[in-house]
Amino acid sequence: MIFYDFEVFKYDWLVVLKNTEDRTTTVIHNDPERLKQFYEQYKKDIWCGFNSRHYDQYVLKAILCDMNPYDVSQYIIAQRQPGWKYSSLFRKIQLFNFDVMTDRYKGLKQLEGFMGSNIKETTVPFDIDRPLTKRELQEVIEYCQHDVEQTMEVFLNRIEEFESHM
C-alpha cells in the first residue's frame, strides 16, 4: 500500500508517499518525471489518502497528464467543482484509491484530536503568490509527512472499513 498526500501552491507542489511494504518514505517536489516513475512502479498497489477520493487523486492524475496541479487544485477548492469534471483524461489513469475519510464531516485534524495525537498545522499560507523558500518548503514537507502518518493511524483504527471493501 502507498499512503499519500499532496500539498499544492501556485508555484510549488509536493507529495509525500509512504510505502507500507518496504517502509520507505518518498518526498517529491515539483518533479513530474519522478512522480511518473513512482506511479509506474506502484500503480498496481492500493493508494490510500485522506480525502483522496475528492482531491489528491485528481492532483496526481493532473501531474501524470502534464497538467498544472495548481489549476486542478483551484478548480476543486476555490470553484468547488468535482475533480473528475476537470478532464476526461483522468478516467484513463488506473488508480486503486482508498479514501480513509469515511465521514465527510470529520476532517483529519478533528480525528487527530479524537485519537489524542498532536495536531500539526503549517504556518505557510496556501495562497502564497511566490515560490516557497527553503525554510517554508521544509515546514510544508514536515506538515505533509505528519498528515500521512496520521492518515495511517486513522486507517489502522478503521481497518474494518477497508476490509469491508475488499
Q: Where do the PLM segments sit?
A:
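Gly/Thr-rich phosphate-binding beta-strand-loop-beta motif of the actin/hexokinase/Hsp70
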Residues: 1-19
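Short, conserved catalytic/metal-binding motifs centered on acidic residues
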Residues: 5, 49, 147, 151
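A short acidic (Asp/Glu
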Residues: 12-15, 57-63, 154
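Hydrophobic alpha-helical membrane context
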Residues: 17-19, 63, 159
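Conserved DEDDh/DEDDy metal-dependent 3′-5′ exonuclease domain
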Residues: 21-110
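Acidic, Mg2+-coordinating catalytic module of metal-dependent nucleases/exonucleases
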Residues: 101-103, 107-166
